[in-house]
A protein has these predicted regions:
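Active-site-proximal loop/helix segment associated with metal-binding centers of metalloenzymes
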Residues: 23-33, 93-95, 99-102, 106-107, ...
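Conserved beta-strand hairpin/beta-sheet module of binuclear metal-dependent hydrolase folds
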Residues: 7-54, 131-148
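Metallo-beta-lactamase
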Residues: 2-16, 42-44, 50-51, 56-59, 64-74, 79-128, 161-182, ...
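Redox- and metal-dependent alpha/beta enzyme cores, enriched for Fe-S-associated oxidoreductases
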Residues: 70, 77-80, 89, 139, ...
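Short active-site oxyanion
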Residues: 41-43, 63-66
Length: 212
């Protein structure tokens, strides 16, 4: 019974139709990945390990239409999931070497709406091609761009792990002030839910800290 319950709990519901996949992969340095169940096709955000259990559960939930890769570090087993479910992988062209054959390449720094409810926002900094995904103006999947720092009880971004350009990452963070969202769902670190107003305030505070 416990095993059956565990199977039903994977992926694990966060809120609404957004799930945490578990099965974090060492290929992505243990990064988190997420699943969105959607009537127009399901999404995988970054890649977990390819495991029979998760493969079966994703199939039961309707398969995959898109695999959104925030950046080159977190592709893990995305190619295997793409083959299994005939899904289209989305990654910025600047990070495309990590996902050769990706079906959709994001270019430049302009936001890209794959679907009316899903907006890809390029945020270069951690890597040159890092992007975040905004879903329903509520959930922001942030990869390694943004997380919740539980020690400081504040949004965080880390200069020591910025592989491309910190000033560019700061500018990218500031551009996120144009959007409203309640959830930050990171690749590493803690996720957090705040009111949209509080999230905007915390983001402004973070940008100010990054500029000092």
């Amino acid at each position: 019974m416990a095993e059956l319950t565990q199977r039903r709990d994977i992926p694990r519901l966060i809120e609404d139709n957004v799930y945490y996949c578990a099965f974090n992969s060492p290929k992505s340095y243990g990064g988190n990945s997420y699943f969105v169940r959607h009537p127009d096709g399901n999404w995988l955000i970054d890649s977990p390990r390819f495991t029979p259990l998760l493969e079966d559960r994703i199939e039961q939930l309707g398969g995959l239409r898109y695999i959104f890769l925030t950046h080159q570090d977190d592709v893990a087993d995305s190619a295997a999931y793409a083959r299994r479910f005939d899904a289209q992988r989305i990654i910025h062209e600047a990070d495309r070497r990590a996902a050769p054959g990706a079906e959709i390449l994001v270019k430049g720094v302009e936001p890209f709406a794959v679907h009316p409810e899903f907006k890809v926002i390029p945020v270069p900094g951690h890597t040159r091609g890092h992007c975040v995904l905004l879903y329903k103006q509520k959930f922001l999947f942030t990869g390694d761009h943004l997380e919740w720092d539980i020690e400081k009880c504040a949004l965080g971004a880390y200069r020591d792990y910025c592989w491309y350009d910190w000033k560019e990452q700061t500018r990218s963070m500031e551009r996120l002030l144009a959007y409203g969202f309640e959830w930050v769902l990171p690749g590493h670190g803690r996720r957090v839910k705040l009111s949209a107003d509080q999230m905007h305030l915390e983001l402004r505070r973070l940008v100010a800290r990054m500029k000092t």
